[in-house]
Every structure is written in C-alpha cells, then in structure tokens.
UniProtKB/Swiss-Prot annotation:
Signal peptide region: 1-32
Protein name (database record): Peptidoglycan-associated lipoprotein
Chief subcellular location: membrane
Source species: Rhizobium meliloti (strain 1021)
Entry annotated with the keyword Repeat: no
Lipidation (S-diacylglycerol cysteine): 33
Recorded name of the encoding gene: pal
Domain OmpA-like: 58-175
Protein family: Belongs to the Pal lipoprotein family.
InterPro entries found in the cross-reference section: Bact_OuterMem_StrucFunc, OMP_bac, OmpA-like, OMPA-like_CS, OmpA-like_sf, Pal, Pal_lipo_C
Keyword Nucleus: no
Residue numbers with lipid attached (N-palmitoyl cysteine): 33
C-alpha cells in the first residue's frame, strides 16, 4: 500500500492515530445533528421553522387561533368544536381591534348552485351572529357565500364533503 504525502493526508493520518481527536470530531458531529433550534411559540415542535407566526398577523390567527369551522350536512348550527374556535377568534379580535373580517360561507358539492349559495350565506351569518354574541362588533364583519364554488377537497365521498362544509374567517374585511 502506497502512502500519500499531501498536507491534507498528513492531517487526516494524525487525526486517525489520535483517539482523543476521533472522539472530539465524533462528539461535534453528533452534537450538531442533535441540536434543536430555540424558536418562539414552540415553533420547533410545530414544524414551522424560522417562519413562526408574528403575533397579530394572519398567520398567527390561522395557526394559533383557527380560521375555519365545520358544519354538519345541510346544517347551519354551530357545533361544540366550532364554538371553541369561534371563542378563540373573538378573544383574538378583541386583542387586535384594528382588524375587520370577512366570513366566507361554503357548502359541499351536493345540491344545486343556488341552494348551496343560500346555505353558505346562512353558515356565514350563523358564524357572524355567534361572534357578535361574544362581543365582536357587527360593523367589523362582512359575510359572503361561495356555496360549492371553492372546495378545499375535490372527490366524491363523505371525507371530502365534510371538509367543504365550512365557514372561513379572513382578516382584512369590513372595518379594517
């Protein structure tokens, strides 16, 4: 076996013969892989990386509060899980009073266009009414219905339909 005589090869041979150097290199390599960045709002655990939500932003509202609620088939009743989300929205809107919102009502693909536009309007209105009951001024909100025109899931089964029966709260509507 021939020996390579270059400065880099010489350094590698020195490191390879020194067990302390091997241990140091391995420790540094493992420590670099195992470190977890210290991010605000426990963003490291949420997979958000360096782009963690800025308080008071649309991203903050969406990620930390929740921007949508879901409805049962052919219903405008606010479910218990939706009430919890809307309560958080009302608290957030009280904390950031400069924002107005638009509440978008949606429906699944079943039914006529006209029926689903009306259903989406009733869902948006029910959402608005709930927020008003929690202290959000009505003049900070507007509603719109998209009916079945803007599905988030497109397929022909109940799992898709349930995702499309929703009301979405978007910052920047009335009053902002």
């Amino acid at each position: 076996m021939s020996r390579i005589d270059t400065p880099a090869a010489s350094r590698m041979q020195t490191i390879a013969r020194n067990p302390v150097m091997i241990a140091l290199v391995m420790t540094l390599a493992l420590a670099g892989c195992a470190s977890k960045k210290n991010l605000p709002n426990d963003a490291a655990g949420l997979g958000l990386g360096a782009g963690a939500a800025t308080p008071g932003s649309q991203q903050d509202f969406t990620v930390n509060v929740g921007d949508r609620i879901f409805f049962d088939t052919d219903s405008t009743s606010i479910r218990a899980d939706a009430q919890a989300t809307l309560d958080r929205q009302a608290q957030w809107l009280a904390k950031y009073p400069n924002y107005g919102i638009t509440i978008e009502g949606h429906a699944d693909e079943r039914g006529t266009r006209e029926y689903n536009l009306a259903l989406g309007a009733r869902r948006a209105a029910a959402t608005r009414d709930y927020l008003v009951s929690r202290g959000v001024p009505g003049n900070r909100m507007r509603t719109i219905s998209y009916g079945k025109e803007k599905p988030v899931a497109v397929c022909d089964d109940i799992s898709c339909w349930s995702q499309n029966r929703r009301a979405v709260t978007v910052l920047g509507g009335a009053g902002s």
